Amino acid sequence: MLTERQLLILQTIIDDFIGSAQPVGSRTLAKKDEITFSSATIRNEMADLEELGFIEKTHSSSGRVPSEKGYRFYVDHLLAPQNLPNAEIVQIKDLFAERIFEAEKIAQQSAQILSELTNYTAIVLGPKLSTNKLKNVQIVPLDRQTAVAIIVTDTGHVQSKTITVPESVDLSDLEKMVNILNEKLSGVPMEELHNKIFKEIVTVLRGYVHNYDSAIKMLDGTFQVPLSEKIYFGGKANMLSQPEFHDIQKVRSLLTMIDNEAEFYDILRHKQVGIQVKIGRENSSTAMEDCSLISATYSIGEEQLGTIAILGPTRMQYSRVISLLQLFTRQFTDGLKK
């Protein structure tokens, strides 16, 4: 159990190191307004904190830096919520204020904005389309041979594709098909659409559409859409600006891992609900042993739909990043409910 004095010194060391990236010595601490102890007392308390494993000495300086154990204690026990600047809150809310909420577009823009606001790498795992439910479908003729099929899901996902309209299918048939599809398929999970169409809808269409076989073939192509989650990155190269990553081998290893989207799928796909903070070697990848990953899930009710994460150095602005992620996930969840 740390004393009040040790807690204050530990928090001050970590706050100072996060801001400066420079090891913190007793002289630096003695100049802080909140530290009213003598230099000798500060040195003794720092020695005790080092012995307990919360801070450690670097080879190049007489100062101390936080250890992984120190960061973990800081995040779990010393972190205070940070109020975000009003301009940033407005910028984020404006992103989600669009009349038509497209989850994929918002996910992509969220990754970009988060990377700019933090100067870290932002990763957003979009909703898995297979669990989305069909809201409606439109088929808009462009000319006699082509049309655009627009599929909208309950989470705001909009999938459009150009399809070929067989000569034997006239425009009145298209209109009948769309009406039947919306009546029978609205609310059906995307992953069940194919079976639903070919086991139930075909029999209904047979009674209304003249050139039935051609129409069914066109429908089959219309609903062939990718169902897996999409992953979006913002600021992939931002880690290069962090002083911890001036080692070429370390940077190469990290950037190679960031480029491996499959690995991030595995890291983000099974996150628990809420905010999670993984520090250093708590991360599963050795390339991330000098990094922290803060992630937050967004959902509708009890259904978890995706994950937003920030990858940065262990010397991360934890309070600010957590506040940003909380705001983003609230806005994302509210947008999906529209």
Swiss-Prot record:
A molecular function GO annotation: DNA binding
Name under which the protein is recorded: Heat-inducible transcription repressor HrcA
Keyword field: Repressor, Stress response, Transcription, Transcription regulation
Disulfide bond annotation, renumbered to this chain: none
The family this protein is said to belong to: Belongs to the HrcA family.
Family annotation (NCBIfam families): hrcA
GO aspect biological process, one term: negative regulation of DNA-templated transcription
Range of residues in the leader sequence: none
InterPro entries: GAF-like_dom_sf (IPR029016), HrcA (IPR002571), HrcA_C (IPR021153), WH-like_DNA-bd_sf (IPR036388), WH_DNA-bd_sf (IPR036390), WHTH_transcript_rep_HrcA_IDD (IPR023120)
HAMAP family named among the record's database cross-references: HrcA (MF_00081)
